[in-house]
Amino acid sequence: MEKRVWDWGIDLGGTKCECVVLDGDEVLLRHRIPTERHGGYQHMLGQIAKLVDECAAKLGQHPALIGMGTPGARDPQTGLLKNSNTTEFNGKPLKEDLERRLGVPVLIANDANCFALAETHLGTVRQHHPDAKVVFGIIMGTGVGAGIVINGQILNGHHGIAGEWGHNVLLPEGPECYCGKRGCVETLISGPALEAWYEARTKRRLSLAQIAAASAHDHVARLTMDRLHLLFGQALANVINILDPDVIVIGGGVGNVQSLYRAGRETVLPFLFNPRFATPMVAPALGDSAGVFGAALLARGVFREALLS
């Protein structure tokens, strides 16, 4: 009997790398190990190989193909990774280096694309908006990014940067961004950016969740949340005016702020080229599992031909 080919996915982060192996919708295995970023690029490649070997030993089967979600994106012209906040990966031929190490084809996609793909095919979009053709899947946490799924497949774009709304400039004189620009969305409404804005005015360091909870009685906390809502609405309206998605999924730590679904939503309309804002804004169903599940979906049949070409 021919051995069944399972779907292997790896979510590569700056802190940990996680592997999942799927048989259809069934999770056969989940396993994670530290990325050990301090060891440098070659050491991190070794950690990924170690993760694959450990999973293969548990399953008694090596992968035929691996999907991988990465910070940053693979440049379609050069094949090098770029725009990663785990800067050790930038300028490196990650796909080719991993294929040499692992001995199997590796399909690479931005981690936000993997998030959007998983929520479309396995998560909240499949459950509640199955007819959606265009999905904008937002991650708002330490950074701000997004993935775009159209007719079930990732949109990468000519430069491989489709969905990177976190690096649209909102305030040209705003804070410096690691990308080299100033006033990017990420420098304004990421979790660390909002926490820093609050701390600069109060000399108190609170988490965003604590700031949100204090906003009913703390004036600066209220201003911080107002800033989030206003800039979120402006930034999202710019996306909607171009993409006009059927559904918007909001993940990440900032995405857990419930007022985004009310006050944040209300601030979209003044910047929108339409008299109403009717697009569903929904929370993800898969939590922090979405990225690794999306990576596994990269290795599933319907995506292989497009991504290998």
Identify what each model region corresponds to.
Residues D11, G67-P71, A109, F136-G143, ...:
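Short beta-strand segments
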Residues G79-N90:
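A charged helix-plus-loop insertion that forms the helical arch/lid used to bind
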Residues F115-H121, A146-I148, N168:
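Adenylate-forming
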Residues H31-I33, N85, H158:
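Short hydrophobic alpha-helix segments
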Residues M1-L65, D75-T78, E96-V104, H121-D131, ...:
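ATP-binding/phosphotransfer module of carbohydrate and carboxylate kinases, centering on a glycine-rich
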Residues P105-T120, H129-P130, F136-I138:
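ATP-dependent carbohydrate kinase catalytic cores
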Residues I161-E164:
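Structural signature of FAD isoalloxazine-binding scaffolds in flavoprotein oxidoreductases
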Residues V104, K133-I138, T142-A146, I150, ...:
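Generic beta-strand structural signal
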